């Protein structure tokens, strides 16, 4: 792979706006950034759960604040990487133009990476997967089950449903501003946010690039268009490795910080989590010793302040620097598309990551409030699927008369934007493809909901409000 192509700043449709070079000096990627920030889908992230249930408190992260943190960390890592590549002469073909573009692309990808997630955090994704596994074989269309009618790839798209794959749909199709190109972002930005460049038929948890579904069957031509333009093809875009690290660092730090602020975990428990690991490597030892020093130095201060200082001044830096060491050491393999690991897991910070993850799992993810929120979210999403999937089965079919009056009324609740997108993509397609697209219409609708809207709609449809 070559940076000239990987950083392709062209768009699927050339911008229809004529800009004067004297008055608009924005780069294509700065323009991407502005389009994302000003989009409704980005704003909706403020009402989507990160980990803790949404509340009026101003410190608990939402998807919006998480995405902004990922964007900031990713951009910072981009600046560090471009500086080192040039200083250490890791790539003779690397130019200043490449160096200027990379941080901007990563900033955009950080904002985008969670834009396809359904309500109620990652548990919402699992709720969708679980519902389709349980129900595709029982719902019928013309006396045959959907599991019999759909192709293997169509079925696997729902069995392996993934919010990251949904990002492509949101920004390139569902954001129907002027035409079918959505936000019409650059090829480089779109490619950087594709974490898994594989279809649902090629999911392989042993391979870093194919751990999860990367794009839906309905978006295969879009995926091919993007990866052909960047010449990444079925390889992972090099910047995706950096985006992944930024995401990991943001949630590892934020979950622990928010947990301390909410009184779910304290410094004594964090130190104990470190002490339960018998042999510390240098990275782990440095972080452990630093927390002990800070807790002694700031004795009497709020624990949330001490942990916040520790995470910001010590942990985050270790995770970033150790991950980037792996990026530099494996630069050629990454550029060749053969590196099969996450940067953070392959680094000397892996032990630290395992401790932080263990602390979060033990104290935070098992918290009663989080568990209750996840169970409620599962109930809401499952019920919405149970309600809307049967309602769309005979919509735009060869036998529309089989739609009930209730089905037709339910369809009026789906926005004209989603229905218009469906009609555009279903035009001229086979009956099976249309049926598949109608199922996607419902998942598109649900993934576009905020937590509050999903909860409110569920309550109204079930006579609870």
UniProtKB/Swiss-Prot annotation:
Cross-referenced InterPro entries: dGTP_triP_hydro_central_sf (IPR023293), dGTP_triphosphohydrolase_C (IPR027432), dGTPase (IPR006261), dGTPase-like (IPR050135), dNTPase_3 (IPR023024), HD/PDEase_dom (IPR003607), HD_domain (IPR006674)
Swiss-Prot/TrEMBL GO biological process terms: dGTP catabolic process
Pfam families: HD (PF01966)
Gene Ontology MF annotations: dGTPase activity
Protein keywords: Hydrolase
Positions of disulphide bridges: none
Gene3D superfamilies xrefs: eoxyguanosinetriphosphate triphosphohydrolase domain-like, Hypothetical protein af1432, putative deoxyguanosinetriphosphate triphosphohydrolase like domain
PROSITE patterns (UniProt xref): HD
Residue ranges, annotated region (Disordered): 1-22
Domain HD: 63-252
HAMAP family recorded: dGTPase_type3
NCBIfam families with a match to the protein in the record: dGTP_triPase, PRK01096.1
Similarity section: Belongs to the dGTPase family. Type 3 subfamily.
Full protein name: Deoxyguanosinetriphosphate triphosphohydrolase-like protein
Organism this protein belongs to: Listeria innocua serovar 6a (strain ATCC BAA-680 / CLIP 11262)
């Amino acid at each position: 792979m070559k940076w000239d192509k990987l950083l392709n700043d062209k768009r699927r449709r050339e911008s229809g706006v004529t800009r004067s070079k004297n008055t608009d000096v924005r780069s294509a990627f700065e323009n991407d950034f502005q389009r994302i920030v000003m989009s409704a889908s980005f704003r909706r992230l403020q009402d989507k759960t990160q980990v803790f249930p949404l509340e009026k408190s101003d410190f608990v992260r939402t998807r919006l604040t998480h995405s902004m943190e990922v964007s900031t960390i990713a951009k910072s890592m981009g600046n560090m990487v471009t500086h080192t590549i040039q200083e250490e002469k890791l790539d003779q073909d690397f130019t200043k133009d490449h160096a200027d573009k990379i941080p901007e692309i990563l900033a955009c990808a950080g904002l985008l990476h969670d834009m396809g997630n359904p309500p109620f955090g990652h548990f919402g994704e699992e709720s969708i997967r679980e519902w389709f596994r349980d129900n595709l074989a029982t719902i019928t269309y013309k006396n045959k089950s959907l599991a019999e009618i759909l192709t293997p790839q169509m079925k696997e798209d729902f069995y392996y449903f993934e919010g990251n794959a949904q990002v492509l749909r949101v920004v390139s199709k569902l954001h129907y501003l002027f035409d079918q190109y959505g936000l019409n972002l650059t090829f480089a930005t779109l490619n950087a946010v594709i974490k898994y460049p594989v279809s649902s038929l090629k999911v392989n948890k042993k391979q870093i690039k194919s751990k999860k579904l990367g794009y839906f069957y309905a978006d295969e031509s879009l995926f091919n268009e993007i990866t052909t333009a960047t010449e990444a093809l079925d390889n992972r875009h090099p910047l995706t490795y950096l985006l992944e690290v930024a995401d990991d660092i943001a949630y590892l730090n934020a979950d622990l910080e928010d947990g301390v602020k909410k009184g779910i975990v304290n410094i004594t428990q964090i130190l104990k989590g470190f002490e339960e690991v018998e042999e510390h490597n240098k990275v782990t030892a440095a972080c452990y010793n630093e927390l002990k020093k800070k807790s002694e130095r700031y004795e009497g201060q709020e624990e949330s302040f001490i942990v916040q200082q520790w995470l910001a001044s010590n942990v985050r830096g270790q995770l970033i620097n150790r991950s980037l060491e792996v990026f530099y050491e494996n630069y050629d393999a990454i550029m060749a598309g053969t590196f099969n690991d996450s940067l953070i897991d392959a680094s000397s910070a892996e032990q630290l990551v395992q401790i932080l993850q263990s602390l979060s799992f033990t104290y935070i993810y098992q918290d009663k409030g989080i568990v209750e929120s996840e169970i409620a979210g599962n109930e809401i999403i499952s019920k919405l699927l149970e309600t809307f999937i049967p309602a769309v089965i005979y919509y735009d079919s060869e036998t529309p008369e089989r739609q009930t009056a209730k089905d037709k009324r339910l369809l009026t609740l789906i926005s004209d934007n989603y229905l218009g997108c469906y009609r555009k993509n279903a035009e001229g397609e086979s009956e099976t493809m249309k049926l598949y697209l109608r199922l996607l219409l419902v998942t598109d609708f649900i993934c576009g909901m905020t937590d509050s809207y999903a909860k409110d709609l569920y309550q109204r449809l079930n006579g609870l409000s």
